[in-house]
């Protein structure tokens, strides 16, 4: 690995330097020892970096210039919906009445915030076809886990606590089996058929009296719509199981079809994906969960309800699984999502899905002569191609992804889902222009040509980034996670 990276903030530290100072307080202070038990007090001084304010500003400005995001360039990361985040969302989120409020304020003082929460719940109920929605979960996987805990409580309350199996397709997001495990279930895999859809015969084989639920994304992770969803619903419901909808791919079907109309009993959404909350830097996210009326009494508490002309928290939820997030989730993301929904309207959301599907199919059609396309039918918002042709020249999908960096494009998701050899999952979203799509397509075609005629150029990529190829094996086996470890290495 060759590095042209910046020094760490700790490496810029010089003893005695500081960014600013505070005037001496004229208020009597107490020692830490008088306030905390000895077991909570550090024995050694914390090694905070000591830098001047200018050095601090330059350090983080330099790092920010090396970041890549949707505002920098094309970001076709499959199943992540890296769409443009409208700046009006940020303006609304910074309105002082919202941004300066506190979650412990009296309900009477935050009626506007509670109205936003209530109104967003109502909008999401309409979009998903669910009867009730909680906004508490802080991310997609958190929403998955919350829904599964609701399922678990429901089965136990109905004398069927023996139901401990959750069916997960082989093309599912990795968080699905992980969430099932965290919720105390066993994962059972159902195979895909030759069209990339759930194999109905295999589903009939794995469903049994212990089936608690099936977790599905529709369209699925291959970008293919599960056209047999009503038959899947019948099979699982007849066995006493429930249907869970992973909302990761909702961007493909808004105002076209609703999870509730497909027979799902619970759904999670990603406000940070479909509804333009900024993401890609680790958060904050938001993963609301919607349920049918039979499961409403199990939702996390409190819920925000409307009582006459006022909005308030409701803790009187009979079978509630309890609180799943401090206060009431990530409110700033609610503001952005609500702004987006109200700005777009139902017609706008429908056009979003139509454009997302059109863009994905356009890229797929143009690349089909240059890459292997495992599933030939029309896709929805994303699709998976395979790099098996390029592998014949010693170039793998990973190498092509690295080469894309040299052209200012963030690589698509690679080697996922696991059932496609040398897979590359591409999701362009609706917000990209035809010019951007053509640039990406032409770039991938040129990389495919390089793989054939000049493979070393691809194998040695990237050539223009701050950091060249990482030694991924060493990074995985001997990670340096603390500055203290870095000092020891040196």
UniProtKB/Swiss-Prot annotation:
It comes from the Bacteria. GO terms for cellular component: cytosol; glycine cleavage complex. Pfam families: Aminotran_5, GcvP2_C. The glycine cleavage system catalyzes the degradation of glycine. The P protein binds the alpha-amino group of glycine through its pyridoxal phosphate cofactor; CO(2) is released and the remaining methylamine moiety is then transferred to the lipoamide cofactor of the H protein. The glycine cleavage system is composed of four proteins: P, T, L and H. In this organism, the P 'protein' is a heterodimer of two subunits. Keywords: Oxidoreductase, Pyridoxal phosphate. PANTHER family: GLYCINE DEHYDROGENASE (DECARBOXYLATING), MITOCHONDRIAL, GLYCINE DEHYDROGENASE, DECARBOXYLATING. The modification N6-(pyridoxal phosphate)lysine is found at residue 273. Its EC number is 1.4.4.2. HAMAP family: GcvPB. It is an enzyme of class 1 (oxidoreductase). This is Probable glycine dehydrogenase (decarboxylating) subunit 2. Belongs to the GcvP family. C-terminal subunit subfamily. GO terms for biological process: glycine decarboxylation via glycine cleavage system. GO terms for molecular function: glycine binding; glycine dehydrogenase (decarboxylating) activity; pyridoxal phosphate binding. Its cofactor is pyridoxal 5'-phosphate. It catalyses: N(6)-[(R)-lipoyl]-L-lysyl-[glycine-cleavage complex H protein] + glycine + H(+) = N(6)-[(R)-S(8)-aminomethyldihydrolipoyl]-L-lysyl-[glycine-cleavage complex H protein] + CO2. InterPro entries: Aminotrans_V_dom (IPR000192), GcvPB (IPR023012), GDC-P_C (IPR049316), GDC_P (IPR020581), PyrdxlP-dep_Trfase (IPR015424), PyrdxlP-dep_Trfase_major (IPR015421), PyrdxlP-dep_Trfase_small (IPR015422). SUPFAM superfamilies: PLP-dependent transferases (SSF53383).
């Amino acid at each position: 690995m060759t590095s042209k990276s910046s020094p760490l903030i700790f490496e810029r530290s010089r003893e005695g330097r500081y960014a600013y100072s505070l005037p001496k307080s004229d208020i009597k202070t107490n020692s830490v020892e008088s306030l905390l038990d000895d077991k909570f007090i550090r024995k050694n001084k914390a090694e905070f970096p000591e830098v001047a304010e200018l050095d601090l500003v330059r350090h983080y400005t330099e790092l920010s210039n090396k970041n890549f995001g949707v505002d920098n360039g094309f970001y076709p990361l499959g199943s992540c919906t890296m769409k443009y985040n409208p700046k009006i969302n940020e303006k609304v989120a910074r309105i002082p009445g919202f941004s300066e409020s506190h979650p412990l304020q009296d309900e009477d003082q935050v009626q506007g915030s509670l109205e936003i929460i209530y109104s967003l719940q109502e909008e999401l109920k309409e979009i998903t076809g669910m009867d009730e929605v909680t906004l508490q979960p802080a991310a997609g996987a958190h929403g998955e886990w919350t829904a599964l805990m609701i399922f678990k409580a429901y089965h136990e309350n109905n004398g069927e606590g023996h139901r401990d199996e959750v069916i997960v397709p082989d093309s599912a997001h990795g968080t699905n089996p992980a969430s099932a495990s965290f919720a105390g279930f066993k994962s059972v895999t159902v195979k895909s058929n030759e069209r990339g859809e759930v194999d109905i015969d295999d589903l009939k084989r794995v469903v049994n009296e212990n089936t608690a639920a099936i977790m599905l994304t529709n369209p699925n992770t291959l970008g293919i719509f599960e056209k047999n969803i009503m038959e899947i619903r019948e099979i699982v419901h007849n066995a006493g199981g429930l249907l869970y909808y992973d909302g990761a791919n909702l961007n493909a079907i808004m105002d076209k079809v609703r999870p509730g109309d497909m027979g799902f009993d619970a759904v999670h959404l990603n406000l940070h994906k479909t509804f333009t909350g900024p993401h890609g830097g680790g958060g904050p996210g938001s993963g609301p969960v919607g349920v049918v009326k039979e499961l409403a009494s199990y939702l996390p508490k409190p819920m925000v309800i409307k009582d006459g002309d006022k909005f308030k928290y409701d803790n009187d939820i009979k079978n509630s699984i309890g609180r799943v997030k401090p206060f009431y989730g990530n409110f700033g993301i609610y503001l952005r999502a609500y702004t987006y929904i109200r700005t777009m309207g139902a017609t706008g959301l429908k056009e979003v899905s139509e454009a997302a599907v059109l863009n994905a199919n356009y890229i797929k059609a143009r690349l089909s002569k240059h890459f292997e396309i495992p599933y030939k039918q029309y896709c929805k918002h994303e699709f998976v191609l395979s790099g098996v042709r390029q592998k014949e020249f010693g170039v793998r999908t990973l190498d092509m992804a690295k080469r894309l960096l040299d052209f200012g494009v963030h690589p698509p998701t690679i080697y996922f889902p696991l059932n496609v050899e040398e897979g590359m999952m591409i999701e362009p979203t609706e917000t990209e222009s035809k010019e951007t799509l053509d640039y990406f397509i032409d770039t991938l075609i040129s990389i495919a040509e390089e793989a054939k005629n000049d493979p070393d150029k691809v194998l040695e990529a990237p050539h223009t980034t701050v950091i060249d190829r990482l030694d991924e094996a060493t990074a995985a086996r001997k990670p340096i996670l603390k500055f203290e470890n870095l000092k020891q290495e040196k």
